[in-house]
Amino acid sequence: MSTTPPRNKFPLPLDAVVERKPAPARTAGLPAVGTPRPAAPTPAPAKPAKPRLPRTAAPAPAPVPASAVEQRASAATAGGGGMASARARAALAARLRAAGIRDERVLSAIATVPRHLFVEPGLASQAYEDAALPIGHQQTISKPSVVARMIELLREGLAADAPLERVLEIGTGCGYQAAVLSQVAREVFSIERIRPLHEQAKANLRPLRVPNLRLHYGDGMLGLPQAAPFSAIILAAAGMEVPEALLEQLAIGGRLIAPVAVMPPAGVPGQTVTQQLLLIERRNRHRFHRTALEAVFFVPLKSGTI
């Protein structure tokens, strides 16, 4: 811990702040006359110490204000033309509203986070289309409508102005969904198993300086037990089932949203494996309620790190 250098006490004696002049030379036959010095001021009586208040726990972090992210996005994309414009983000949010997204907090987050910062420069012109785009390493950035829909499902039942509490994201990718989550949650933890993507997400998010978001490199199928329990968990990759470790890390009353594989009926030729969203609500320590939702398409959920 750094320390502050000692400060001079005030008021200072006059001779400490006025430049001293040399005494005049003695004149023959006359005694030297000394210049009178003012008396040092009487120090003020010490003030009685104020009683110390008991320490209270630090408040939980809050979602980053949209205005702060917008200002940082503007600074990061100065001179970027139309893609840096808030109008492009607002138009995307308006299209999602027309498509059925109703959570205004989610729509505000979509209208705030600059998606073009999270895609390759050559794809910037497509950043505000409702389309999944490649980000390298055989991974994609999800469609904005899917991001909004999944987060809306996590927030279902909350008051309009109430944030999610502690959220875990499995599959950081380029960092876009994590940035959107940071606008609607107090704390966001995101895990990525592919090292170059983890580093890319850090670089993408750095200009936005999001204080309530923590990125981790590791196996997402194991979750993040040191930070559990989580009030919400969101998976950005599809597995045959939701890993048991993630269910264990979901808080009672919490929600998990994930794409999962759906096997075709046995004995039916020509059918392929499909995917659908699965919403899991934890009712108590041992009981989970599952709701199958619409069809989706995600990259596969894999274990380990690379």
From Swiss-Prot:
GO cellular component annotations of the record: cytoplasm
GO molecular function: protein-L-isoaspartate (D-aspartate) O-methyltransferase activity
EC number: 2.1.1.77
Reactions accelerated catalytically: [protein]-L-isoaspartate + S-adenosyl-L-methionine = [protein]-L-isoaspartate alpha-methyl ester + S-adenosyl-L-homocysteine
Active-site feature positions: S142
Pfam family, one: PCMT
Main location: cytoplasm
Pro residues bias locations: 38-48
Gene3D superfamilies: Vaccinia Virus protein VP39
Major enzyme class: transferase
Stored CDD domains: AdoMet_MTases (cd02440)
InterPro entries in alphabetical order: PCMT (IPR000682), SAM-dependent_MTases_sf (IPR029063)
Localization (cell): Cytoplasm
Highest rank taxon of the organism: Bacteria
Cited function: Catalyzes the methyl esterification of L-isoaspartyl residues in peptides and proteins that result from spontaneous decomposition of normal L-aspartyl and L-asparaginyl residues. It plays a role in the repair and/or degradation of damaged proteins.
Protein name: Protein-L-isoaspartate O-methyltransferase 2
Organism from which the protein derives: Cupriavidus necator (strain ATCC 17699 / DSM 428 / KCTC 22496 / NCIMB 10442 / H16 / Stanier 337)
Encoding gene (name): pcm2
